[in-house]
Amino acid sequence: VSLQDFHGNYRYNFLDEHYRKFFAQVPVIIQWDDHEVKNNWSPAEHAELADPARQAFRDYWPVRGGRSQHLYRKLSFGPLIDVFVLDLRDYRAPNSDNDQAEAGPETLLLGPEQVAWLKKAMGESKAVWKIVGGEMPLATYTPQWGLDSWANGKAEVLGREHELADILSFIKTREIENVVWLSADVHYAMAIEYLPEKAIFKDFKPFWEFIAGPLHAGTFSPQDDLDPTFGPVEHFCA
């Protein structure tokens, strides 16, 4: 697969008139996920595809900081909002059963450098709202397609959830207020409230997550219940 092939994928989407109008009129913060390279990819398994895919992504979606800049970043919008854009692809371990009892190299999703950056940036933020944009939902999981995100469907902190639990505990310890998560990846929209009193892991502040559906892919309903580890309560799904 060549760079030209990846360019062609982007051009194909822009053949749609409504898609073009949307991006001409609406400011958008862009981040990549799996389908910019290959379904549910990881660097260890698909390194040969990642380089041309990353170049094509940057060709069509310029990112502040230039091509040498990593894709995770913070964007500030006055005193009200800081947006923390995460990269859940470049630093992850390959997919597994995601049920490791302890954190380790095989449970990485963000990786230690990005986690340290996120903690520092959120701890220093003076914005009223802290929006965390993290491509993949926190409590949804798709065992039929591989356990590609944080969750695994089991009622305890396992696998990649160790990393998420650490971040949520940090937010509580530092008393960081008004944190909202935005995610996508799945082919439906959902609003989820996370409540410690309903959770297995309870060392976090209540927060909301909003999941957006796709612009140019089919939609379908969730096929599994939400992972109960962090006490998710579904308020909307479409």
How should each PLM-predicted stretch be described?
Residues 1-238:
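Metal-dependent phosphoester/phosphodiester hydrolase catalytic core
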